[in-house]
Amino acid sequence: MDNVTAAKKLIGLLDLTSLNNKDTSYSVAELCHRAQTPYGNTAAVCILSRFISTAKHELADSGIKIATVVNFPQGNAELSKVEKEIETALTAGADEIDAVFPYQDFLAGNLNICADFLQLIGRSCLGKTTKIILETGELKLASRIQEASLMALMSGAGFIKTSTGKTKISATYEAANIMLETIREGKYQSGFKASGGIKTTMDAKQYLLLAKSIMGSDWLSPQNFRIGASSLLDDLLQTIKQGY
């Protein structure tokens, strides 16, 4: 797959993201405009929940999904707070919920808390796309990444996602490989999302090719594969413009 072909495909698989405390309604409106490119729209925008109404207005009839985050970024909020976050987001019009797995509890062996969290996500997000953020850079070990992936997949997660982008280590090729192989081996009807530190067409292309090699080319749709990034879109557009 040449870079231009990859860039065009990746636009439609992108969750164009801005999750910064300095975000404003104006900056989110601009993000929504950027998501609608001459080469097609991004799959989604991923924004803080307080800007969902702005995004709904800007993206009306575009087909672009609105994603937001809960239990973000530390993954250690009380379940009652997470439930309220979900309720607020869905009432505002979110289509997709990216929820941070309680990875600190997971590392401490508190698997019952993790199970309760996953049950809450499944129960509260019926009919919506859920993405469980494992924070693989903090899990570190392959065995932990696989175990956390399995917990999320067995709970019915729509996607398993690498990272919040707020820790020292974000998405890695190695973690993506483990997660994709876990989906394939268990024949789970769940997708994969890489996020955090993916800035260039070449960065994103390697995840696309990895997923293709493990899951097959037919699997590479927005229903199964996403990349979350903020600055990647500019590089994808530049790649297309340059023609190589």
Predicted segments — roles?
Residues 2-40, 50-192, 201-230, 238-244:
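Alpha/beta enzyme core
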